[in-house]
């Protein structure tokens, strides 16, 4: 898996490692390893520093518990959606900064629904 990061994000990755610095990327990698049956060996995560083109590399062992948690979460979301349930939102108002820039804002908040 390869990502491109700015210098600030890059320094944090170097200092703390993938699991702590970029938990979303670590989760994505765990799911890939699980569903592509690549769990027996560590995955190679690489990142390029967009500002100076330096390369970061880290061997990431398979985190089965993380992959299972995420898979269970996805199943819950899919099941709820198919049942027509509205899941709790991460924020209480549609004007929250993350909601304003979300591709799913209209669906989540019922705008135009």
Question: Residue spans of the language-model regions?
Answer:
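Conserved catalytic cores of phosphodiester-cleaving nucleases, focusing on short active-site segments
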Residues: 1-16, 32
């Amino acid at each position: 898996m390869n990502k491109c990061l700015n210098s600030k994000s890059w320094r944090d990755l170097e200092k703390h490692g993938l699991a702590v610095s970029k938990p979303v990327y670590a989760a994505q990698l765990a799911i890939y390893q699980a569903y592509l049956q690549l769990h027996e060996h560590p995955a190679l995560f690489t990142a390029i520093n967009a500002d100076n083109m330096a390369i970061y590399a880290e061997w990431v062992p398979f985190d089965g518990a993380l992959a299972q948690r995420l898979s269970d979460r996805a199943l819950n979301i899919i099941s709820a959606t198919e049942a027509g349930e509205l899941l709790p939102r991460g924020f209480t108002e549609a004007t929250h900064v993350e909601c304003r820039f979300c591709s799913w804002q209209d669906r989540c908040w019922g705008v135009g629904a």
